[in-house]
Amino acid sequence: AYDAGQVAPYEAYALGLAHKLLPEILHCTGLTRRPVFIPAVGNFAQGMLVQCPLHLDLLPGAPKAADLHDALAAHYARTNTPEQYVKVLPPTDDLKLAADTLAHTNQLELRVFANETYRQAVLVARLDNLGKGASGAAVQNLRLMLGL
C-alpha cells in the first residue's frame, strides 16, 4: 500500500481490540486482563509505534511508572545480546515520538510515559516493522532460546 501511495499520513489499526498478538502478550507477561493494544503505521516506508495504555492501579502491586521502567530495564539487561537490539530508554520530558526514527535497523526501543496523578501509563515500542518485523524477532528469540 505504501509503494502505491495509498497510505494515510498516520493510521491506527486493530481498533477492534483483538490484535493477533494479544494471546502471546498475555502468555508472555502473565497478565490476567487483556491490555489495550493499538499499533499504528503511517505514510513512510518503514517504522511503527505500538502503544499499550495501562492503568497503574490495576496492575499487581500498583507500581509507579518508574517501577515499570526499572523492571523492563532489568529484564533486558539480563536477556539482551551484546548487540542490544532492545533498548529501554530513560524517562524524558519530550512527549513526542517519530515512528520512522529506527528505519533500516533491527532495533526496538521501549519507553514508559506516565501521568502519576491519574495513575495512567502508556508503554510505547518504536521499531522498524520491516527491519525488526517477525523475522528479526524470530532470530532474536532463537538466539535467546539457544543461549547465544
List each model region and its residues.
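C-terminal substrate-binding/catalytic lobe of Rossmann-fold NAD(P)-dependent oxidoreductases
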Residues: 1-123
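NAD(P)-dependent Rossmann-like dehydrogenase/reductase catalytic/cofactor-binding core
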Residues: 107-148
